[in-house]
Amino acid sequence: MTAQLIDGKAIAASLRQQIAKRVAERRQQGLRTPGLAVILVGSDPASQVYVSHKRKDCEEVGFLSQAYDLPANTTQEDLAGLIDRLNDDPNIDGVLLQLPLPEHLDASLLLERIRPDKDVDGFHPYNVGRLAQRIPLLRPCTPKGIMTLLESTGADLYGMDAVVVGASNIVGRPMAMELLLAGCTVTVTHRFTKDLAGHVGRADLVVVAAGKPGLVKGEWIKEGAIVIDVGINRQDDGKLVGDVVYETALPRAGWITPVPGGVGPMTRACLLENTLYAAESLHS
């Protein structure tokens, strides 16, 4: 058996087309164009690439996009002031603060400064709390995108044993809550977990978001399991690989996401989806 690929690139492209269509309809109706402000502090190369992709996505779907490229020595006070101004700007529906920030800045305080109804990344404690209470509003983009990928397989998630490898605030923890909402029995593993292979081997669905290339071996995967690889790691030879050993997981899994072209495009598409939702449902 060879796993079927979950083509995140194609699914994300379809979602962007739907968003662009809705933006065009809004214009025809005389409604405001959704607006996204993207803040980049410093010159981290990976962050610059991510931000350029997000700005390109905005142009593709017809969003108003405002770019703020700030020097690495920007102060906490100055950055907080910019966020406050964007919070008050009626043309802006979403405020995105690109992470990581320079070490002298307190990311937690700054993320909490973004108004929850403009927190299109879904990182604010208010939005994470709503997800935990089973009344999600703006959902964290990567877990939200993964749920869309899972829906594309047609699999019935109710009662599935799901394992999330990694317990970060951005992916692992909200992912577990999304899977609980979907009816899965969820185990979250982390750096202190004993017998990771045993947990993975019992799972019908594995979501790996640890940021460690090749952490999950293909032979650990249960026959027919769904494997979602969130990791994206650049090797010395420039090749991008995930947290799962793809070549050995492929013959065992039922469905699997490639790296690249799996989860990453969906994260970006869900950022646009959240921004459109904020414009239509929260700021109309």
UniProtKB/Swiss-Prot annotation:
CDD domains (alphabetical): NAD_bind_m-THF_DH_Cyclohyd
Entry-linked NCBIfam families: PRK10792.1, PRK14186.1
Function in brief: Catalyzes the oxidation of 5,10-methylenetetrahydrofolate to 5,10-methenyltetrahydrofolate and then the hydrolysis of 5,10-methenyltetrahydrofolate to 10-formyltetrahydrofolate.
Self-association state and partner proteins as the record states: Homodimer.
Keywords: Amino-acid biosynthesis, Histidine biosynthesis, Hydrolase, Methionine biosynthesis, Multifunctional enzyme, NADP, One-carbon metabolism, Oxidoreductase, Purine biosynthesis
The keyword Cell membrane appears for this protein: no
An example Gene Ontology molecular-function term: methylenetetrahydrofolate dehydrogenase (NADP+) activity
Naturally occurring in which organism (per UniProt): Pseudomonas fluorescens (strain ATCC BAA-477 / NRRL B-23932 / Pf-5)
Sites where the protein binds NADP(+): G166, A167, S168, I232
Gene3D superfamilies with a match to the protein in the record: Leucine Dehydrogenase, chain A, domain 1, NAD(P)-binding Rossmann-like Domain
EC number from the UniProt entry: 1.5.1.5, 3.5.4.9
GO terms of biological process kind: L-histidine biosynthetic process; methionine biosynthetic process; purine nucleotide biosynthetic process; tetrahydrofolate interconversion
Gene that produces this protein: folD
Recorded superkingdom: Bacteria
Protein name as it appears in the record: Bifunctional protein FolD
Metabolic or biological pathway, per its Swiss-Prot or TrEMBL entry: One-carbon metabolism; tetrahydrofolate interconversion
Catalytic activity: (6R)-5,10-methylene-5,6,7,8-tetrahydrofolate + NADP(+) = (6R)-5,10-methenyltetrahydrofolate + NADPH; (6R)-5,10-methenyltetrahydrofolate + H2O = (6R)-10-formyltetrahydrofolate + H(+)
Taxonomic placement: Bacteria, Pseudomonadati, Pseudomonadota, Gammaproteobacteria, Pseudomonadales
Family to which this protein belongs: Belongs to the tetrahydrofolate dehydrogenase/cyclohydrolase family.
